[in-house]
Amino acid sequence: MSFSITFTELVNVAIPQCGVVNFKALHLLLQGILEHIQITELKKVLSGEEDFLQSSPAVFIPREGDAQPVINPMKRLSNIFDQVVDRIEKIESKLAEMQDIPTTSQLVEESYGDKRPAEEMWNNIKIQKRIEGNEKATEKFTRTLQDLLNDLHVLKGSVETVQKDVDTIKFIFEKVNPQKLELLGDDLKTQSRKLGALQREVVTLQNKVRAVPQPEEMVLWSGLHEAMFSPEQQKLEVEPSGVWQSMVSLPGSPLEQPEDAGYIHIPIHSATPVPTMVQLGTTGALREEELTRAVELADSQRPELAQAFVSQTQRLERAQASVSQTQRLERAQASVSQTQRLERAQASVSQTQNLRQTAPFPFPVPGFVPGPDFMPVYGPRPGMATPSAWALPRGLARGNYWPIWGIGPYQPGQGPLQPMGPMPRVPFPAMGSDIPWTQPLPQGTQWYPNIEERGPEYEEQYPEGYQEEMPMDEAPQEEMAVYGALEEEIPTEGAPQDGIPKGRARERISKEKVPKYRTPKERVSYHKASKDVSPEDTGTKDEAPEVKVLKKVVYKDRPQKDKAPEPRRKGPSSAIKKLRSAIASAAAAAAAYAAHANSAAQLAKDAVKAIQDVPANQLAAKAALIASSGPLGAFADFLGAGFGHGATSNTPFDEGELEEFPEEFAAPFNPFTSKPVLSQAMISATQATSPEEKKKAVQYSMGHIAQMPSRHNSLKEEFTNLSTTLNQRLNYLANMGSSGVLGSTVNVLEEKIINLQKARLQEEELERVWGHQIDTMKSHYMVLDRAVERLQIRMDDLKILKAEIERLDLVKADKNVMDLELNEKANRDALASKANRVDLETVAMELNEMIHSMLLKITNYESDWKKALKHLRKDLNTKLVQSDLNSLKKDIEEVWKVVRKLLLEGLRFDPDSAAGFKKKLFERVKCISCDRPVEMMTGPQLITIRNTHGLSRIRPASANSYEYLQRQLIREQQQHLHFQNFGVHEEGQGFQKDWGDGPRNENTLKHKSHDLSTLYPYGDPELMNYDTAEVDILGVDGVLYKGRMSSQFGTRTGEKDIAAVKVSYYTIPNLTDRVRPGSLLAPGYPPLSPRTSITSATTLHSATNTTTARPPSLPPVPQLPPLIPVSRDTQEAPGSAKRLKSPRL
C-alpha cells in the first residue's frame, strides 16, 4: 500500500534529533530532491586524486604491454567503504572477544606457538578498568564543575546584593546633613556621660544588693511581732495548775507524834498572789498529775516537750530523794539541840504577849493567802455570813463555829472594812497557843460543809469597801476592838518586812498597792465596785495571767459539822518535832531550788547555743520548744519561780541585829502587786498594728530575754543569801525561844519563796509568748525569700543592662572619624580606577559563556564516547574474529597513542621528531625578495578519526542565562550560514551520487559529517589559498611586511578567512581558523566579547588590532594556553601548494 509524505516530514524522519541519522530516509530525501530539481542525470567531473577514491594497497598492477584497466569510480568507492566496514567488523569482533573472559580450556587450547592468551586477557582487563576509571573521573569532574557553577550563581547573587547595599548607603550618605550629624554627636556625648553615671549607680546598687543578708539571717519586725504576740500563742500561756497544790500536810518527823499534836494553827498574814512552792516530798498523786499533764502537753503541742517534761520530773524526784535522806540525818543530829532551844522559847511566850498589847497595830490591806492545799483563798464566801455583819463569833469555844483560817484573807468583822487576816487551811507547825480556835479539829471533821471549792471559776475583782485609802484612826471603834482582841492572841510584830520599818505600823496604804484577788464568776455581783470608783480601779481578768487550777475534793459531810473539836493535848515533844520538820523542809527547798537554779542557767546557755546552731527552717519550732520548757528545763506551771514573782533583794541579818529585834513584831505582810508597766506593755504589744508599734514591742520583749541570764544569776545568789538568812533566823529563834519570832521568820521565808514563784511564773509566761512568736517567723521567711528572688531578677536585668552599656561603649561611633569621612570629597581619579559595573557584568557574562561552552563540549564528548563504545561493543560482539586480534591490537595501540598524544600535548607538531627527519619535512628554498635561503615546512600530517562531537547542544535554561542561550543560537545560525556559503562555493565542482551508507564528498558536506573527521594541526589547507592569502614576509631590514602572492580573488579569500575564524581561540585566531568546522576541535571556545570583530585571520597582528579594546578600569583577562602552538618559524614559503597526503587507518 502506497502513501504520500511531505519533504518536511521526510526530513524529520531522516534526522529526528541531533546526532541521529536515518541513512535510508536521508537517501530517499536526497533522491527526491534531485528528481524534483531534475539533476539526476547530471555528472560530476572528478580529478581522480580524491582521497576517498583511492584504491587499497593490494591493487592489481598490470604488466607491461597490457592495456591499462578502466577504473570505475563507484567500484573504487565501494572498495574503500567495504574495507572500512570490514575493519570495523573486525574491531567489533575483537572487542567482543576482549569483553568476554575466556575460559581455562580456551586459554589452554590457544596457548601454542607465539600466542599468549593469558597476557592478552590481562591487558584487556586493564583496558576495561582504565576506561571505567576515566568514566568515574569524568563524572567527578562534571560534579565539581556543577558545584562551581552553583557557587558562581551564589556569588552573582551576593554581588547584586552588595551592589544594592552600596547604592542604598550611597543614597543615605548623599542625604546626610553635617549639622544634624554634629547635633547627633553632641547627643551621643551626653548619652555617654549619662551611661557612665548610670554605670556607677549600677555598681553602687550592686554593692548594696550584695550587702543584703541572706533570707535565713533576716527577721522582719512584723514577723517577729506576729511570732511573739499572735493570738494562738495566748492559748499556750502558762496557767497556775493544781500541781502547786497539795492536799497533804508537811512531812512530819520520823519520830512518833501524838494525835493531838497533828496541827498547830497559827494565822499568818500574807499578801502574795500565788501559792507556796510544792513540798519536796510529793506524793504519788502529785506524780501522777504531773505525768498526766505531760501526756496532755504531748498531745496538744509536741512530743519533744513532753519528753523534756518527764525527764525533768525524774531528775527532780531523784534530787528530792537525795535531799530527803540528807535532811533525815541532819534532823537526827540536831534534835537534841532543838529540844533545848524550844524549851527556852516556851518560857518567853508570856513576855511576848505583854509586849504585843502595847505595840502599834498595823492596818492590813486585802491580799492573797495560801489556802489549805496551797491555793488562793479570798474573802468571806457568800453563804458563810452576810456581807454587812461579819463579826467575830463571841463564843469561840462553841462547837458550831466556822474555822477562821478557812474563811478568807481577813478575819470576820462587823463591816466591810473589818480587817480579815489570812488563815491557812493546812497551818504551818509552830509553837503552842492557848487560843481555843487554834486547836486542831478532830480527825474526820469536814470543813465547809456548804461550800464547794472551785478552781478556774474565779475572776479577779476588788471587793467593796477596800477601794479607798483608810487611815487607822478612821476605822470604827468596834472593829478596832475586835481586831485588838484578835491581835492579843496572834503575834503580829517583831519580824522585819520589805519596805516597812521595823516596829512601825502602816497607817496609810494607797489603793494602787491593793492586790487583786479572785471571786467566783457566778458571784461577782456581790463584790462589784461602787459607782463612784473609776474603771481603772476595777481589775479585769485580762490584767493578770489566767490561772488554771485543778478542782479539789468537795466536803459535804454535814453530820460531822456539829462535832466539837477534841481538846488538844499539849506536849513540847510534838511541837519540837513539828518545828524540826518545818525547818528541814525549808532548808531542803532552798537547797533544791539552788541546785535547780544552777541547772537552769546551764540549760539556758545550751538553749541559746541550740537556737544558734539550728537550721533556719527549724528555727521557729526549736525556739518554741526551748521557750516553753523554760530556763529550768521544766514547765513553770509546776516549778513556779522567777524574778518577777515577788523575789526581792535579800536582807542579811547577823546575830547583833537579831538580838536588837523587839519581841513584838508586826504582821508579816508584804503586799505584792503585779507590775503595771509590764502588764500594760504586754497588752499594747498584743494589740499592736502598725510596724513601729510592733518594732517597739519586739524590742521591749527582746530586752527582757537578754536580761534572763543575769536574773538567773541574781536568783542563784538570792537563794544562797536566803538560805543563809534562814539559818540565821532559825538559830536566833531557837536561842530566843520565841514562838512568834519563829512563825514570823517562817512566814517571811514562805512569802519570799512565793514571790520567787510568781516571778518565775511571769518569766515563763513571757518565754512561752516569745517561743510562740518565734514559731510564726517561719512564715515570714517565705515572703523574704520571694523578695530576694525578685531582687535576683532585678540583678540579672542590671547585668544585661551593663553588658549592653559596655557593648555600646565599644561600638559607638567616633566623631572625629565621622567628620573626616564626611568632609572627604570624592576623587575622580580614584573613581576612574574603580571597576565599572557594566564592564564587570560583561566580563562575568563572558566567563559564564566560556564555562558553559566547556561544559557543553565535555557533555558532547562524553555522550559521543559512550555511543562509540556502545557501537563498538555491539559490532565487535557480532563481527569480530578472534584470529584478527593481533593485527587489530597493533592498529588500535597506534591510534590510541596518537590520540592520547594529541589530547595531552594539544595537537602540537614536533618537527624534531624522528618522523620529521625521516620524511624530510623541511626543504631548502630561497626568498623571492632577497634571494636568501629559507627552510620551508612541508604539508602537515593529516589524521582521520571518527567524529565524536556532533553538533552543539543547547544547555538547559536552569544552568545558563537566557542571554547566553540566545547568543549560542545566533552563533550556531552564523556557523550554519557559513557552511551553506561554503557548500555553494564548492558546488560548481560537481559530485557523484551517494547511495545508502556509502562514502560522501566531505568537501561539500563536511558540516553534516558525523562519522569521520580529518585533523589538520596547522589548519585546513583547503580553506587557505596561499596564492591569494595575506601572509607575513620578513624583509631585509628585519621588519615583517604583509602581502599576497597574487592580487586575484583577494576579496573572496578574505571572506573565506572571516568565515573560517568563527570557532577560533580568542588571542590566536590565525592558528585556530585552520581547523575544519566539522573536525574534532571545530566547536572551540566562544569569544569572550560578543562585540569582537576580526578583519584578518592569518596574523596575530591583525587579530590584535581588530579585538575590541577593553575598558581601562578592568585588568587584562588571563589568556588560556593555545590549543595549537604557533610555529617557531614565522616565514612560510609562498606559492608552494605541495602537501603530503594523510595516511589511512
From Swiss-Prot:
Any Pfam family matching the protein: DUF4795
Keywords, ordered alphabetically: Coiled coil
UniProt keyword Cell wall biogenesis/degradation, yes or no: no
Protein name: Uncharacterized protein C16orf96 homolog
Record field: compositional bias (Low complexity): 1100-1111
Coiled-coil residue windows: 74-101, 186-212, 744-816
Compositionally biased region (Pro residues): 1112-1124
